[in-house]
Regions:
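Acidic, metal/ion-coordinating pockets
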Residues: 1-259
Length: 259
């Protein structure tokens, strides 16, 4: 979320990757811009240089106009696959880890409930499942499901159970406590939270957010809180033979959420 989140990535991600022998890193970057809305080419390249292998997104993907051009030639930046047909960029892709050791499928989807108009997420998910197949054309598959409500996220988790390595929820900015491996072997968490200042209202300045709710005439457009960010996410340890999860660990690193 904004500059504090990017600062936390720059400061801590390389340490976390080294300590945990991480092969592949996915960051949802749709709130990475300075105002917390969208992402730019410069910021995406900053995240790549600081350790991201793929950047996923959600409903804020088009908040910066330049993204519509950039996403067409940068295949490591994904937008939700169930946006309207003909949208710029791609909603899923296949990538290699360093030294071409593993082949990773990454799928970016967005919920239909309480979100901007999107194509039916389950219909699109069915089509993608036929194209990216665990242990046939990829070693591992991760799904970023950007959604508003818990029930829809849980449903998509069970829908992908046993055919993907992990399904992780994004969008609500607060990490949930249901980190687990589903019955057929897919790692799951309803929402992995944000990399941002948690002494805030979902990453935005708390005083201004309260003014907004009170309809105070002095309230201004929401802007990110500026305190120390917590780096929030998950680490999945997967079985190379099956492509399924062996372990999922919730990651809460630094900032006010750990104090």
């Amino acid at each position: 979320m904004g500059p504090p989140g990017r600062k936390a990535i720059k400061k801590n991600l390389s340490i976390i990757k080294k300590e945990n022998s991480i092969d592949f890193t996915i960051i949802n970057g749709e709130n990475a811009a300075d105002d917390g809305r969208g992402i730019t080419k410069v910021i995406a390249e900053e995240l790549f240089s600081n350790g991201a292998d793929v950047i996923t997104s959600g409903n804020h993907i088009w908040d910066k106009k330049e993204t519509t051009d950039y996403i067409n030639f940068e295949n490591r930046l994904l937008r939700p696959a169930n946006l309207a047909e003909g949208s710029p960029g791609n909603g899923y892709g296949v990538y290699f880890t360093k030294n071409d050791k593993f082949k990773i499928g990454v799928i970016n989807l967005m919920g239909n409930v309480f979100m901007k108009k999107t194509d039916d997420v389950f219909e699109v998910a069915k089509r993608i499942k036929r194209k990216i197949i665990l242990k046939k054309n990829v070693d591992f598959i991760i799904v970023d499901f950007h959604g508003e409500i818990t029930s829809e996220k849980m449903a998509i988790g069970h829908f992908f159970d046993g055919v993907t390595t992990g399904v992780v929820g994004t969008h609500t900015h607060v990490p949930t406590a249901d980190t687990r491996i589903l019955k057929k072997g897919t790692a799951y968490q309803t929402d992995i939270g944000m990399c941002g200042d948690y002494d805030s209202v979902i990453g935005m300045n708390k005083e201004n957010s309260i003014k907004k709710f009170l309809k105070d005439k002095d309230a201004v457009t929401h802007f990110p809180a500026e305190g120390e960010a917590t780096l929030s996410g998950i680490i999945i340890d997967a079985d190379h033979d099956t492509g399924l999860a062996k372990k999922i660990t919730r990651l809460i690193y630094g900032g006010s959420l750990t104090k």
